[in-house]
Amino acid sequence: MGINRDKPDYWKKDTAASIDMYNEWFMNFAPKTFRETRVSKSASVESALRVTGYLQHLSPDILKSHPEILPILRMSTCPPIARDRLVGLAGVRKSLVQNMEDTENPRVSPRMSEKTLKDELGKIVNTICRMIDSDVFVWIDEKREPDEVEVARSATIVADRLCGALSDPIIRNAQEKRQLKVISQYLDSKGYTEYKNGVKFDEMEPGTYSFRTNVQVKVSADSEQVANIPVDVLINPEGAKKGDLPIMIECKSAGDFANVNKRRKEEATKMQQLKNTFGENVVFDLFLCGYFDSAYLGYEAAEGIDWIWEHRISDMDLLGI
């Protein structure tokens, strides 16, 4: 028996309730989250300004030592430059820019020769310097040091540009953290224990759960090639036996209908890879909050994927938790 995928008569009502829940969260918490991020970004911009001599001494060596400032530099131009636009304008390798803007580990390309790296970074510097927004960084044309007010003002402007470019990921990340917290509180109330330091998916004890755990799967049914796929939540029920697979849950939130229907194949692909590896008895469900319409739900249901609505988290009990 399914949880929600076999109850289409309730889908519209649940979608409406889920939208209301998402919108209430967005109105109450999104502005605060955005402001906090802007404050953090402003501090990062001020740091980048100091490192570059307030953009008057930007050089390949500085970029090499501080690759993390590249997104800030892109937002310091007139007009601000998208990542791929910078690659085209500067005529540099896309992989270099991607490595420098890696959020987890910003770095220059390790296998690139010193000469090539210096040439590539020089092209980036020339492009940025040529397009610096002199209306924001008013001291550059005047060839002087900025005062504290000018630094703070310019940092706020660039931080706003950064946050504007990142607004969807900022909100999505905040919502994901909130969803994981809701699940954690629910499982804790039932006596479950979280693996806070990581665990292999096939070594979980009964009555435990973990977040953002990799599960190794076959890429396709007729292939021996394997890949790690991250799963938001793994739960091993109290009554689980040795060798049982944990319950797998993917958290999903959406602030509009368009994006969910663009991305719905991702879950179906993940489900198919899990079935290719572990058989038909895999439990892989979604935890939904927001704009998920009948088109999305019908697609997932046809792929054998069930879901739990966040506004009715008690449905999780039907998983045997």
Question: Which stretches of residues belong to each language-model region?
Answer:
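A generic alpha-helix preference that emphasizes hydrophobic side chains
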Residues: 134-137, 184, 264
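Short, charge-rich amphipathic segments
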Residues: 102-123, 155-160, 191-206, 229-237, ...
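Detector for Asparagine
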Residues: 4, 23, 28, 99, ...
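Catalytic core segments in nucleotide and nucleic-acid processing enzymes
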Residues: 199-321
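Acidic-basic catalytic patches of nuclease active cores, encompassing PD-(D/E)XK
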Residues: 162-222
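Nuclease-adjacent, charged terminal/linker segments that flank catalytic cores
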Residues: 1-157, 161-170, 177
